Amino acid sequence: MKLINAYTDGSCLGNPGPGGWAVLLRYKNNEKELVGGELDTTNNRMELMAAIMALERLSEPCQIKLHTDSQYVRQGITEWMSGWVRRGWKTAAGDPVKNRDLWERLCAATQRHMIEWCWVKAHNGDSDNERVDVLARGQAMAQRSTVASR
């Protein structure tokens, strides 16, 4: 099973507003960057999209170290998800889970991989985290430019 390092980040200008996500996939000496964005979104949706795209892009089952600066993503998938599912996609307070569509997609994307979810402190000198931060912010700015030119 291939060992992949994945670095993910999401960015949103305004929250809600234009947003972007970015992924850096690394296998041995090979790297692949993935980016995308949406016109009207939130930072949490972009963080989720980055993780989803990292996992969905891999064509075979892999062992993955997924690095994210989002506690929302890391805690959601490792701590909260099982309770949400058990409660019919309700939080402990009984409210509907926000971003359920993306959480379900992320859950499905995890099924064929062995994943270690690693939290990285944002803006703290991790060069790969900084790299995806710049890419995600660039995608958010590109989305904002698209809105401004309409």
UniProtKB/Swiss-Prot annotation:
Endonuclease that specifically degrades the RNA of RNA-DNA hybrids. This is Ribonuclease HI. The keyword Metal-binding applies. Its cofactor is Mg(2+). It is found in: Cytoplasm. InterPro entries: RNase_H (IPR050092), RNaseH-like_sf (IPR012337), RNaseH_domain (IPR002156), RNaseH_sf (IPR036397), RNaseHI (IPR022892). Keywords: Cytoplasm, Endonuclease, Hydrolase, Magnesium, Metal-binding, Nuclease. Gene3D superfamilies: Ribonuclease H-like superfamily/Ribonuclease H (3.30.420.10). Belongs to the RNase H family. NCBIfam families: PRK00203.1 (NF001236). Monomer. Pfam families: RNase_H. One of its GO terms (biological process) is DNA replication, removal of RNA primer. Mg(2+) 1 binds at D9, E47, D69. Its main location: cytoplasm. Residues 1-141 form the RNase H type-1 domain. It catalyses: Endonucleolytic cleavage to 5'-phosphomonoester. Binds 1 Mg(2+) ion per subunit. May bind a second metal ion at a regulatory site, or after substrate binding. PANTHER family: RIBONUCLEASE H1 (PTHR10642:SF26). Its EC number is 3.1.26.4. Mg(2+) 2 binds at D9, D133. It comes from Xylella fastidiosa (strain Temecula1 / ATCC 700964). GO terms for cellular component: cytoplasm. GO terms for molecular function: magnesium ion binding; nucleic acid binding; RNA-DNA hybrid ribonuclease activity. CDD domains: RNase_HI_prokaryote_like.
